[in-house]
């Protein structure tokens, strides 16, 4: 079953490719090891009219189907760049979960339940591409199928076919994911109750969106509710950043002053018409000074540690060279690949509606219940 789903998602991914090229790739995927090897060699030698991203994606699919196909440096570099920001602990956790997933349904459920980011999904793809023999065929095919489904759903072509209610549902999903961050700041004084209230509201909105899917009447109300929740999420995030300094300040200024100072303060306050007087006792002054010095020292230590980490990354781990390479490829991409992609884009635009395409009318796999799927 997973193999059939992989073929369907591959056809959807290659929807804008020339029909002859698409037929060649699909025939190779369904034709066995030797056919897949031949097609992978054609892709690697750039003998098929595919853009850079399409070529690397198809090579990854074929190698995961048949590990005997040798890895392609271009695809490996793309995967390394996509996962460069991922922590090692996250990578270990993902590998453990992949081996326990079992098949396509297990892999997809893992992605949905954990709400994986793009770099986490790419870590899974990199694992089955670099070490295909460490995983069963079901896990390899399941990982690649889930990845292709994710790419298809994120494409502009896919989003343009989603209804207004579908877009609303996707926005609700983003708000619900953002609200889970409230768990991290729920323990901060003054924000716990607000965070729990916000989570309840977003969950209610998600349920309401599912119930009113396709309803034109409820859409404006849902849009307003989404904007309100998004604004509160952002405001609470900004409040959480300020609380560290605010708590230090209030922990000092809220201490009880001596009776003498309190009387003096009240007297000065009553005798002042246009000036507000705030009195600090001597101990509070010392504590504020120490707090300011402490924050300054912590900031300097943080910067020093960051500098040391960057030096270690540069000289010991050799990451500077890779970063420079990334910057170079971003500013000055490979001219040959860029020119080839531009030429292919123009060719496809020139063909327009004249190109025969038997799958133009076939819908991309998508269901109402699948709105919140990865």
Curated annotation (Swiss-Prot):
A GO biological process held by the record: monoatomic ion transmembrane transport
Modifications the protein undergoes after translation, according to the UniProt entry: Palmitoylated.
MF GO annotations: channel activity; structural constituent of virion
Sections of the chain in a coiled coil: none
Residues marked Cleavage (site): 259-260
Phosphoserine modification, residue list: 337, 362
Key words of the record: Disulfide bond, Glycoprotein, Host cell membrane, Host endoplasmic reticulum, Host membrane, Ion channel, Ion transport, Lipoprotein, Membrane, Palmitate, Phosphoprotein, Signal-anchor, Transmembrane, Transmembrane helix, Transport, Viral ion channel, Viral matrix protein, Virion
Name the record gives this protein: Polyprotein p42
Protein's organism: Influenza C virus (strain C/Taylor/1233/1947)
């Amino acid at each position: 079953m997973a193999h059939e789903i992989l073929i369907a998602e591959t056809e959807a991914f290659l929807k804008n490719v020339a029909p002859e090229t698409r037929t060649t790739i699909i025939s190779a995927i369904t034709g066995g090891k030797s056919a897949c090897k031949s097609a992978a060699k054609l892709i690697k030698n750039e003998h098929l009219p595919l853009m850079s991203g399409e070529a690397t994606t198809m090579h990854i699919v074929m190698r995961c189907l048949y590990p005997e196909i040798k890895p392609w440096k271009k695809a490996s570099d793309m995967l390394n760049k996509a996962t460069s920001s991922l922590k090692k602990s996250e990578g270990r956790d993902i590998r453990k979960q992949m081996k326990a997933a079992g098949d396509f349904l297990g892999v997809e459920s893992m992605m949905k339940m954990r709400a994986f980011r793009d770099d986490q999904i790419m870590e899974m793809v990199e694992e089955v591409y670099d070490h295909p023999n460490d995983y069963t065929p079901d896990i390899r095919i399941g990982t690649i199928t889930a990845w292709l489904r994710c790419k298809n759903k994120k494409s502009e072509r896919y989003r343009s076919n989603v209804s207004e209610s579908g877009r609303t549902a996707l926005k609700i999903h983003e708000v619900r994911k953002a609200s889970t961050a409230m768990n991290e700041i729920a323990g901060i004084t003054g924000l716990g109750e607000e965070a729990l209230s916000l989570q309840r509201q977003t969950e209610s909105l998600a349920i309401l969106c599912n119930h009113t899917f396709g309803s034109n009447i409820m859409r404006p109300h849902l849009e307003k509710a989404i904007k309100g929740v998004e604004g509160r999420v952002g405001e609470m995030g900004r409040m959480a950043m300020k609380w560290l300094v605010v708590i230090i300040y209030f922990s000092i200024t809220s201490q009880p002053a001596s009776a003498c100072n309190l009387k003096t303060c009240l007297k000065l306050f009553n005798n002042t018409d246009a000036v507000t007087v705030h009195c600090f006792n001597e101990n509070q002054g010392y504590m504020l000074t120490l707090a300011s010095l402490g924050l300054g020292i912590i900031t300097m230590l943080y910067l020093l540690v960051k500098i040391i980490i960057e030096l270690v990354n540069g000289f010991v781990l050799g990451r500077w060279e890779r970063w420079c390479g990334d910057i170079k490829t971003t500013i000055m991409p490979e001219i040959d690949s860029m020119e080839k992609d531009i030429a292919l884009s123009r060719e496809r635009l020139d063909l327009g509606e004249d190109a025969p395409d038997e799958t133009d009318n076939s819908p991309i796999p998508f269901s109402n219940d699948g709105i919140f799927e990865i």
